[in-house]
């Protein structure tokens, strides 16, 4: 985002920052969502700051743009019943969701730190290919503990036998979807190779020490799957 902002060079090019998985992340003194024209956050229940159901927020330092967004989220009204903004919809965050988020917001930094601590434990146990090591800041939020392994199916089978759940984030590229098949073909050998080797380990603040120890022991037992090939 910093590079995109600098490349703006005074031109009026809006920059939209996707913050859906980076609640609380910091680079230097800047939080995620603070640099771009607007930052977009998801409050889906599995996010680092999640509501009870679907929800989200847009942040901006532009007062006029903020007012425009407020109009759009409520039918395009500029005042009660006067619909002046095209593209408006009913997308208000209801009070129950907002109240739940306000309870968890003060805990966000603490919960992110717990996620980072879990990732560090995994790395110390031998998960050398865990992607968090490439974060630009030590204030990354460890939304997912994604790593790269050889023979993913066997690795997953081994962890499952130990009672450990895993996931794949994500199993498809945009170019795999029928909706993009009309576009010119684009060779993506690195991405194609990665999607068959990535696996996500459990990583959430509610994990107990025993659960973390269990995953670490499984990583140590299956260390050979992390060797580069």
Question: Which residue stretches match the model-derived regions?
Answer:
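Catalytic PLP-binding core of fold-type I/II PLP enzymes
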Residues: 1-29, 62
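PLP-dependent aminotransferase class I/II
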Residues: 1-4, 26, 61-229
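Short gly/pro/ser/thr-enriched loop/turn and capping motifs at secondary-structure boundaries
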Residues: 21-23, 49-50, 120
């Amino acid at each position: 985002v910093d590079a995109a902002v600098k490349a703006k060079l005074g031109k009026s090019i809006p920059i939209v920052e996707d913050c859906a998985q980076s609640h609380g992340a910091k680079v230097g003194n800047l939080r995620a969502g603070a640099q771009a024209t607007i930052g977009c956050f998801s409050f889906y229940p599995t996010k680092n700051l999640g509501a009870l159901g679907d929800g989200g927020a847009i942040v901006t330092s532009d007062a006029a743009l903020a007012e425009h967004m407020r109009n759009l989220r409520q039918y395009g009204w500029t005042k009660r019943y006067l619909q002046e903004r095209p593209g408006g919809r009913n997308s208000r965050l209801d009070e129950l969701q907002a109240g739940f988020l306000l309870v968890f917001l003060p805990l966000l930094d603490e919960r992110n730190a717990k996620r980072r601590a879990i990732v560090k434990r995994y790395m110390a146990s031998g998960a050398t290919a865990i992607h968090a090591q490439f974060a630009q800041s030590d204030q990354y939020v460890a939304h997912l503990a994604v790593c790269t392994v050889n023979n993913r199916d066997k690795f997953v089978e081994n962890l499952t036998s130990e009672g450990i759940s895993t996931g794949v984030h994500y199993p498809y590229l945009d170019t795999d979807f029928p909706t993009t098949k009309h576009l010119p073909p684009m060779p993506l050998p690195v991405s194609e190779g990665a999607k068959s080797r990535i696996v996500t380990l459990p990583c959430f603040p509610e994990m107990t020490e025993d659960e973390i120890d269990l995953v670490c022991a499984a990583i140590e037992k299956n260390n050979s799957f992390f060797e580069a090939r």
